[in-house]
């Protein structure tokens, strides 16, 4: 097979090695636009896991890399005069130029031809080839030539960074967070060779502008940063090598192959340098592509197999890198954190490293974090917390007004569609009661509608008829009598998403018969097939507001501990907040302040009735749709809601419009809770694809939320909290009839 590889970086050279080694009959040529002896940058980072992957693919390359690498276990975080050191991380640093030289040497020894100063713009420029590999980096000319097929998307991030070196040999992967008159600077530093370290400096655009630095003034940059980091450099110099100020591009492509052309490495995807994964991804791409090509399938089929196998892992790492880069872009919001919590937050910023992962690496640090968090929880709740043993974060108390939860796990509202004219029944008793027995600190009812016309379906729960109070009281009294859990009720009006069938009979489809009229902020149907709502008049607003107040009064009579008002997911109050669903021309439309006017009126009215007990509000922090609510809007919505009388914000996202395109993934909504909690400075609950105790503990210890809300996990396992306690070695006593469970040892089925 004739293979043309465009780009003599780690991706292209390593692929050439693997292809030529596995089949010496392949004719493999590598084209490089620059001179082969040129090189830029300083060191690159590999985890031990990556080194092991490389070792399995080509032991000879791995041996050469290991001999050239510097190794370290520790991470140091310098923040507000404090230094936190974490161990057990196992990294290696290699000089980039050395890496390229050893890869090129290995490739040539196998018979690969490497040609420098050859700019390849189109596949035809390579000459006859059965396979063309575009490994020509972020600014790939081949990718751009075939952009209509690859569908590239480049997201240029906001922070500025410069890649420098230094003669100071850092003994650990070191992060500085350095304030200056211009603003806050972040530094990523690590050793890659004796007496040589990478020194990446990053700052917000406004900080960089205030410093007076210029993009391409290397000498000015070095002089400024040597002065700024004089103490940290300990008399050592900074080194420049094409060290210009840049912004990082996150590269994604709709597809990675077209005909006999395939994207590899940075041409296909990038991951922010804060997770140290660019070269890792490049070399692992090469391993995956070589494996696919070895199958003997026709090239187009092999390329499709490569993309199918490789894309999920890459996209997962890109999500982690996105979380990490957004953390570094927003470090300013964490400046008030305790240095220990700041360090924990930084170490877990990508959402891939959890409380449990970190405990296995560095048990002493996590024990210190847990002890600190337990003390904080005791102070916040006014309840003593035993430190022998120290409880995991999820098993610490939390106070909302006079309500004290015994732990931080919340059963999320989950519609059951089993009520009759709003009356809940035995199904709801078992559903809520079993989760309360299961150990959660707070159980919240399904969306409970404040009027008959406010239901999603005929099977929705209600709080609008006198008889509803007794039906709900039966459940509330059971929870209070038999468990330590508290119970809240979520009050709502479905708005334009009402009068539909249960999801299993047709999601969002109108009823076949018996539809009722709908209300919304504006007369816009949720789907073209849905009923068009009537735009609410002031009289409608009064009636619905009073229905919320009446439902709050009835909830008090039923004995609920907390009310959650539903301002999310495209239901009635949500339609006022989102610009996508609010097209009003009066004082309730237009600016966010105007759009919030009616939801805030409802919050204030419910607060006046509910008086001393806590109120939560569930919001959609973003709409996941162009022109809709963005993350900064979510911060303001939360701030206004708490100012109007809410005590905590249950942070969700989306659901507002049918055309939304959520970016799903593990903990996908937690970053919104994190931002709201620190920028609006309000308590938050986070929800969305949280499944493990490790994730929940991480969220809490890092300060990303105050309570952790789980839905599907509680459907799968009503006793999720008790099983988490067992997993973590924490003793959570069972109710007396179940006390024998303490002596039971579960075994794999």
Language model region names:
Residues 1-4, 8-72, 78, 87-98, ...:
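Glycine-rich FAD cofactor-binding loop and adjacent beta-loop-alpha segment at the N-terminus
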Residues 8-21, 133-134, 244-323, 327:
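Conserved mid-domain beta->alpha element of the FAD-binding
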Residues 29, 261-263, 443, 708:
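Residue-level marker for buried hydrophobic side chains located in beta-strands
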Residues 48-163, 365-375:
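Conserved N-terminal helical subregion
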Residues 105, 128-248, 252-253:
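Conserved FAD-binding catalytic core of PHBH/FMO-like flavoproteins
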Residues 135-137, 271-272, 414, 712:
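Glycine-rich, N-terminal phosphate-binding loop of Rossmann-like dinucleotide-binding domains
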Residues 291-382:
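C-terminal helical "tail/cap" subdomain of flavin- and related membrane-associated enzymes
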Residues 368-749:
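Flavin-dependent oxidoreductase catalytic cores
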